[in-house]
Swiss-Prot record:
<dbReference type="InterPro" id="IPR039418">
    <property type="entry name" value="LexA-like"/>
</dbReference>
<dbReference type="GO" id="GO:0042802">
    <property type="term" value="F:identical protein binding"/>
</dbReference>
<keyword id="KW-1251">Viral latency</keyword>
<dbReference type="GO" id="GO:0001046">
    <property type="term" value="F:core promoter sequence-specific DNA binding"/>
</dbReference>
<keyword id="KW-0678">Repressor</keyword>
<keyword id="KW-0238">DNA-binding</keyword>
<dbReference type="GO" id="GO:0019044">
    <property type="term" value="P:maintenance of viral latency"/>
</dbReference>
<dbReference type="InterPro" id="IPR050077">
    <property type="entry name" value="LexA_repressor"/>
</dbReference>
<dbReference type="Pfam" id="PF00717">
    <property type="entry name" value="Peptidase_S24"/>
</dbReference>
<dbReference type="InterPro" id="IPR015927">
    <property type="entry name" value="Peptidase_S24_S26A/B/C"/>
</dbReference>
<comment type="subunit">
    <text>Homooctamer. The DNA loop is maintained by octamers of repressor cI.</text>
</comment>
<feature type="DNA-binding region" description="H-T-H motif">
    <location>
        <begin position="30"/>
        <end position="49"/>
    </location>
</feature>
<dbReference type="Pfam" id="PF01381">
    <property type="entry name" value="HTH_3"/>
</dbReference>
<dbReference type="InterPro" id="IPR010982">
    <property type="entry name" value="Lambda_DNA-bd_dom_sf"/>
</dbReference>
<comment type="function">
    <text>Acts as a transcriptional repressor that allows virus to establish and maintain latency. Prevents both the viral DNA replication and the exit programs. Clamps the two operator OL (operator left made of OL1, OL2 and OL3 sites) and OR (operator right made of OR1, OR2 and OR3 sites) together by binding to them and arranging the intervening DNA in a loop. This step allows repression of lytic pR and pL promoters by binding to OL1, OL2, OR1 and OR2 simultaneously.</text>
</comment>
<dbReference type="InterPro" id="IPR036286">
    <property type="entry name" value="LexA/Signal_pep-like_sf"/>
</dbReference>
<dbReference type="GO" id="GO:0010944">
    <property type="term" value="P:negative regulation of transcription by competitive promoter binding"/>
</dbReference>
Length: 237
């Protein structure tokens, strides 16, 4: 049993008329044919002809594709579909971001040591400021600013953590050889290095070869794992 196709409205027919007129005007300039338009749209040539001739109605998807191919705005041939696309955009833009952002406090290196799991005498109210990231970490995580160039890798090598870069430290994540970490070397001396194991011994390795490796012995304790890095916003003015 066949069903009779619903005829296009006057508005849809006007859209098709305007679309075809634009195509006829621009096809030579853009080097287009119905066949090439069909290829770009991923449909048959007869389907394109049906859109141009008002046999099949345009929809938002096809209108957007044709606007891109003809290098015009959708509104130039279909004001109603242009409104529809705009309303769809508005609805999407009002939705919460798919990538959540999390804020963590920025501490000084001294505060970072006091924030280690066994001490933790500083509170987040002592933060110098708060910085957001899409990286999810524990509630104990905090930012530190890299000091010096011991973690600046040679040119062309990655990763590299130049002076002034922010690193996100999570005291609740386990640190394994190969991880970057903040370690306490005794007293209030802290260092940012890569933890490595060599010949059964654990070392703190700088990325800058001009600096020596540091043995991680009984006076060395890990404060937290470095899980992310980024430049402060003020770096870019």
């Amino acid at each position: 049993m066949s069903t009779k196709k619903k005829p296009l409205t006057q508005e849809q027919l006007e859209d098709a008329r305007r679309l075809k007129a634009i195509y006829e005007k621009k096809k030579n300039e853009l080097g287009l044919s119905q066949e090439s338009v069909a290829d770009k749209m991923g449909m048959g040539q007869s389907g394109v002809g049906a859109l141009f001739n008002g046999i099949n109605a345009l929809n938002a998807y096809n209108a957007a594709l044709l606007a891109k191919i003809l290098k015009v705005s959708v509104e130039e041939f279909s004001p109603s579909i242009a409104r529809e696309i705009y309303e769809m955009y508005e609805a999407v833009s009002m939705q919460p971001s798919l990538r959540s952002e999390y804020e963590y406090p920025v501490f000084s290196h001294v505060q970072a040591g006091m924030f280690s799991p066994e001490l933790r005498t500083f509170t987040k109210g002592d933060a110098e400021r708060w910085v957001s990231t899409t990286k999810k970490a524990s509630d104990s995580a905090f930012w530190l600013e890299v000091e010096g160039n011991s973690m600046t890798a040679p040119t062309g090598s990655k990763p590299s953590f130049p002076d002034g870069m922010l690193i996100l430290v999570d005291p609740e994540q386990a640190v394994e050889p190969g991880d970057f970490c903040i370690a306490r070397l005794g007293g209030d001396e802290f260092t940012f290095k890569k933890l490595i194991r060599d010949s059964g011994q654990v070392f703190l390795q700088p990325l800058n070869p001009q600096y020596p490796m540091i043995p991680c012995n009984e006076s060395c304790s890990v404060v937290g794992k470095v899980i992310a890095s980024q430049w402060p916003e003020e770096t870019f003015g």
